[in-house]
Amino acid sequence: MITPPHPKAPPLSCDCHFHIFGPYDRFPLDPGRRYDPPPASVEDYLAMAEPLGLQRMVVVQASVYGTDNRVTLDAVERFGRDRARAVAVIDDRVDDVALRRLDAGGVRGIRLNLVSGNGTPEHQLDALARRIASLGWHIQIYADGDRLEQLAPCLARLPVPVMIDHLGGVRAGHGIQHAQFQALLRLMDTGRAWIKLSSYRASSTGHPWDDSAANVRALAAAAPEHCVWGTDWPHPGMDPIPGTGNLLDQFLAWVPDPAARHRILVENPARLYGFTTTDQ
């Protein structure tokens, strides 16, 4: 049973990063995948999210599905398009009809995964960015800190916003003065980038993953209008598996100001993903 965090997230808070896996008889995994996740259904997600007060959600296409976005689109439909959006994986074989279909299905961005692979190819980044610009989408990047530092000049020139996963992959143990973190801050300073304050994958110490506090606070202070937060549920590949309520507790402790929390959990996601209201 999940214990709700204290204090709770504000109304209309958005979980901007999680995955759905299965059912595998309907949505089989890609043969080129690098791991085999256990099933994680829409019902499982809601059983986790509702007690935490997470009322909006962004389903991120996982690498194990390649460019077959059916499981992600199905999840958006089942959650309801009034409260759910998606980030898809595509390559240059996608045609304009398919892009419009994805947009109608709630997709608001595409993901480039340089860690788990099996996603949007890096060499197609520029061309795909130009194609999705007219849709108002963004590109989401999952990379380690070293690769992100190398890519930063290219990302800053793209014609679409760029969402950086998991604190930019910069290890918390490096400290906020490290060259990788400073490169991330410079990228945020361009006003073109967004950052997900999902912190445990950047931890250098492991459980309870609380060494990322300085990174989260620095980013929340540097780019308050371009920060969002996500659970990364069901935490694929993690051992031990984080308690999702504990992760939300951490975030609320690290960002104690109610106005800042509301901005990161409600206002910023509404602006980026196109939700229509920011208060109840």
Descriptions of predicted regions:
Residues 1-12, 38-56, 224-226, 240-280:
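Mid-to-C-terminal alpha-helical segments outside catalytic/metal-binding sites
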Residues 14-18, 57-60, 84-88, 110-112, ...:
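Hydrophobic faces of well-ordered beta-strands that scaffold small-molecule active sites
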Residues 17, 49, 72, 102, ...:
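Conserved, mostly hydrophobic/aromatic
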Residues 31-64, 83-89, 107-115, 137-139:
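Divalent metal-dependent hydrolysis catalytic cores, especially in the metallo-beta-lactamase
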Residues 66-146, 153, 194-203:
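Active-site gating/metal-coordination segments in enzymes
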Residues 67-84, 215-223, 247-252:
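Short, electropositive alpha-helical surface patch
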Residues 122-229, 237:
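Catalytic pocket-lining loop regions of alpha/beta-barrel enzymes
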